[in-house]
Amino acid sequence: MRKITTSAYMPTEIEVENVSENVAKIIAYPFETGYAVTLAHPLRRLLYTSTVGYAPTAVKIDGVSHEFDSMRGMLEDVAIFIINLKGIRFKIKGDSKREVIEYNFTGPKEITGKDLNNDIVEIVNPDAYLATINEDADLKFSVVIEKGIGYVPSESIRDYVSSDYIALDAFFTPVIRAIYDIENVFVEDNPDYEKIIFTITTDGQVSAVDAFKNALEAMYQQMSVFKGIVDIDTGKSFTKQIPSGEHSKLFESIENLNLSARSFNCLEKADIKFVGEIVIMDESELKGIKNLGKKSLEEIKSVMEEIGYPIGNEEIKDKKEVLSKKIAELKKKAKDDK
């Protein structure tokens, strides 16, 4: 029998099983009815869209002008060669996000992924087939390898690659397959709780467990915007909610500074409504506020020091453009809502 509660049951168990080198099962339970699919579905989507991987984004082949061309001495035409190339999974060994790799093969030879290994890249599927060339062929080509997420069409890549390169559709995700099953599980003789069983397969660029961790982090980052919601009251009959983030104090009304009436009124008349607007000003700009005397200036400087944002704060100055834009948006929204 299900008991009446005022909060959802918190899952307490997680199991990780490495089925093979690139396959893992991740099991978590127990969840309230309906919670399992609510969490599992977006995680599955994020596994595909947010896991960082590597892919060939452009190729230049000596003697070839376009993807529908053919090459003497190569069994495959260029279109098939490109399809095979996109099926080879590269991994840059260093920290670089982009590398241009040059290859030169003389026939007769059957070229596979292992032949593309070098000091710069590792091929995680070395048995993948690329092309076959005969004794008359001399195959020279350059491949651009980039680091990214998700899928980027060739039209977007064509905008920035050299005209002598053929732009490729780039499939960055290293996650080959991500599925989940939901099963019922008992909690105190109640079978209505749920278990999530993820089965994740990658191409070897990253482990399945690391891919899952990455998806969790991506979900947390995306959802965190809703975590920091605060009220803003400017004293002008509007209250808005905005994400607070790392520097929530910056988006509070200047009323919260508890300044003297004279100091507050000077700022108010200068259309300064948020703490962040003061932070991004230097002392000379503050002095330029109409009717703001020396005593008020010292009061404002003292209060800003107390809340941890001294005038001329270098950390915030580096974010001035972003902060100014966000505050401008808040002001506009407040004005529109009047």
From Swiss-Prot:
Annotated Gene Ontology cellular component terms: cytoplasm; DNA-directed RNA polymerase complex
Stretches the record annotates as Alpha C-terminal domain (alpha-CTD): 246-338
Protein name: DNA-directed RNA polymerase subunit alpha
GO molecular function: DNA binding; DNA-directed RNA polymerase activity; protein dimerization activity
Pfam family membership, one: RNA_pol_A_bac
Superkingdom of the organism of origin: Bacteria
Keyword field contains Cell cycle: no
Region (Alpha N-terminal domain (alpha-NTD)): 1-230
Summary of subunit composition and partner proteins: Homodimer. The RNAP catalytic core consists of 2 alpha, 1 beta, 1 beta' and 1 omega subunit. When a sigma factor is associated with the core the holoenzyme is formed, which can initiate transcription.
Function: DNA-dependent RNA polymerase catalyzes the transcription of DNA into RNA using the four ribonucleoside triphosphates as substrates.
Tagged with keyword Nucleotide-binding: no
Known EC number: 2.7.7.6
Catalysis performed (reactions): RNA(n) + a ribonucleoside 5'-triphosphate = RNA(n+1) + diphosphate
Recorded name of the encoding gene: rpoA
Record's keyword terms, sorted: DNA-directed RNA polymerase, Nucleotidyltransferase, Transcription, Transferase
Family matches, as SUPFAM superfamilies: C-terminal domain of RNA polymerase alpha subunit (SSF47789), Insert subdomain of RNA polymerase alpha subunit (SSF56553), RBP11-like subunits of RNA polymerase (SSF55257)
UniProt record similarity statement: Belongs to the RNA polymerase alpha chain family.
